[in-house]
């Protein structure tokens, strides 16, 4: 790999690892990121594993620093199951998205573009095409072609031609049992790429309407990525609506077949706890106490990962960033699109600023706001009404 030289001075760096295994490559890269004074502000590592990884704390590193990172990762992997999991580390500057399940299926659900790819040998040409869809021009890759017991892979003699036909350029001097290179197709990418590839928008100005849990969490996420965010709310203070209840319980949904709703809520509960642990005071604003759910039939179910939390405290913590400005006691009545920017207006028609992106997080109020805006925006209100 050509890291950390390649990421020097960058705002963010995304790595795709299709063979996460025991997480050792992630631990090595995380450690390199911590030590590098020119590291990117954000490191996003997407790892795909067929089963929940098992981290061997003692064998993962020869020193205390490495073992400390391994212990943190091992603790975050406890009680994880199939599906997608977002794990925040280093004050949320390092994001690990762990995808547990069939590698090809998981890869097909991704929509980002990676700067670096760490790959196992692909099973067929379709797998190579999935890798290409996760690339942008210049993305670097490193592929381990070591034969894996029981794995179905493309024969090593066919891989170079297959990769080149898909747009990859190969380095002439790769190590034994490995291929490396970059994605640099001869054709124009925008006209040959499916619309599922989302290009990250350059950080700019964003307006968010609504300062509850939804709006504050989006504001916090955008601010971490370098955006300047203004949050508007009709209440005087953030969390003035339902998000301002004195305390609440965060408990995952449970189903007999562990359906997507259950998996999503379980991952969401774990992610909420990570934010709370980083931003709030245990015992005062929240507590990972676990929750006992009493069933109507008289039974009970213990949720070890559940917690109680004061939502308003979390909202305030999310908004406490120099990149975020809160504007209260302000109603947004209309949106207007012009010159690729959005202008917000209050009920008196006063211009409240122009923004590259607007996020509506004002619950049922968004329908009325869309209807009161221009024709193109009103169409979105009609679509919303059908949901």
Pin down the residues of each PLM region.
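SAM cofactor-binding core of SAM-dependent methyltransferases
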Residues: 2-5, 10-78
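Glycine-rich FAD pyrophosphate-binding loop
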Residues: 224-244
């Amino acid at each position: 790999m050509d890291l950390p030289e390649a990421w020097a001075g960058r705002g963010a760096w995304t790595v795709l690892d299709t063979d996460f295994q025991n997480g050792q490559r992630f631990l090595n890269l995380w450690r390199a990121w911590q030590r590098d004074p020119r590291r990117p502000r954000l490191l996003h590592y997407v790892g795909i594993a067929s089963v929940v990884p098992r981290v061997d704390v003692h064998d993962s590193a020869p020193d205390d620093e490495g073992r400390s990172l391994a212990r943190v990762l091992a603790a975050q992997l406890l009680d994880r199951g199939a599906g997608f999991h977002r794990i925040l580390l280093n004050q949320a500057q390092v994001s690990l998205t762990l995808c547990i399940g069939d590698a090809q299926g998981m890869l097909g659900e991704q929509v980002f573009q990676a700067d670096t790819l760490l790959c196992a040998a692909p099973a067929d040409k379709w797998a190579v095409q999935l890798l290409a869809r996760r690339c942008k021009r210049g993305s670097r890759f490193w592929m381990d072609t070591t034969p894996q017991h029981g794995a179905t892979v493309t024969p090593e003699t066919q891989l170079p031609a297959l990769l080149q036909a898909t747009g990859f350029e190969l380095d002439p001097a790769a190590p034994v049992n490995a291929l490396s290179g970059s994605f640099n197709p001869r054709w124009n990418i925008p006209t040959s790429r499916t619309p599922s590839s989302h290009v990250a928008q350059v950080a700019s100005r964003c307006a968010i309407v609504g300062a509850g849990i939804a709006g504050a969490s989006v504001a916090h996420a955008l601010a971490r990525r370098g955006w300047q965010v203004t949050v508007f709310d009709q209440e005087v203070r953030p969390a003035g609506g339902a998000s301002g209840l004195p305390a609440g319980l965060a408990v995952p949904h449970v189903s007999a077949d562990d359906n997507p709703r259950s998996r999503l809520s379980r991952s969401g509960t774990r992610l909420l706890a990570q934010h709370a642990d980083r931003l709030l005071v245990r015992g005062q604003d929240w507590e990972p106490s676990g929750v006992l759910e009493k069933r109507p039939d008289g039974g009970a179910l213990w949720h070890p990962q559940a917690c109680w939390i004061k939502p308003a405290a979390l909202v305030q913590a999310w908004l406490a960033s120099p990149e975020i400005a809160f504007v209260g006691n302000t109603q947004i009545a209309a949106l207007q699109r012009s010159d690729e920017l959005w202008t917000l207006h209050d009920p008196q028609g006063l211009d409240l600023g122009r923004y590259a992106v607007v996020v509506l997080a004002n619950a049922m109020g968004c329908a009325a706001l869309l209807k009161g805006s221009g024709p193109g925006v009103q169409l979105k209100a009609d679509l919303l009404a059908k949901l």
